[in-house]
Amino acid sequence: MEVPAWRKTIGEMVRDHMRSPEMEHYFSVKMNKPRARLMITQLGLYIRHRRDCWALVSANCPVMAVKQAILQHEYGEVIKDQFSDYGHLHLIIRQAEKLGMTPQEVIDTKPIGTTTATLHAWAWITHAKSWIEGLSALTVTEWTNDDRLLNDVGGGHSTRMGKRWTDDMGIAWRDMPNFVAHSQADEEHSDMFLPFLERYAVGEKEQMALDAVKESLDLFGGEARHRHRQRDALCAAHRRHRRGEIRHELVEGF
């Protein structure tokens, strides 16, 4: 396939994924601080893990032009770009501060079980499979943030989740730097690897690349759903804790 055909094919796969009942439910859940804290800290782990995965794809790939593109991609993610002079993890830290969290809390975050499983799966794809499959699996997750592709269904992941944060917690868009950055930077990232798929994902490798895209979208959706369930569990625990405090105060009052 040529670049336009790759863009159309992957684009439709992403649109189908983002319109799925599971993702619609994910975006419909009311956001609050316990849920938001879990989300932003697990996203921090995801961003850090991406660096390992892109390095694995580069190590598996013999094509210097692909290695150069990955380094260009990673410079903005790790070093600096127009959104941060300190890399994109700094955006997570700044956004978490709006939830009352410290930088150290973000850095010291432990993954929940489903995060661990999902990150291990992406690591396996990028390590054990071909570089074409690894590249396809990684780049498609950035397509889920592409507002150009998803505008008619409410926007990409960052835009839609940012709206939830604003509607449910009153946090302004400008105070969500991670969402702001990835709603824009990932549009560029969606395009940058398509020429390599056109050139190298040919013959049977074409279907291998598309299978990797599908597998990665399934991982992305599954991780989001499980994170949502964990947020619900945390909120339920928080409510039980608050009810216990209130009962204690009532007893003390007597």
What would you call each of these model-derived segments?
Residues 1-254:
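Non-heme di-metal
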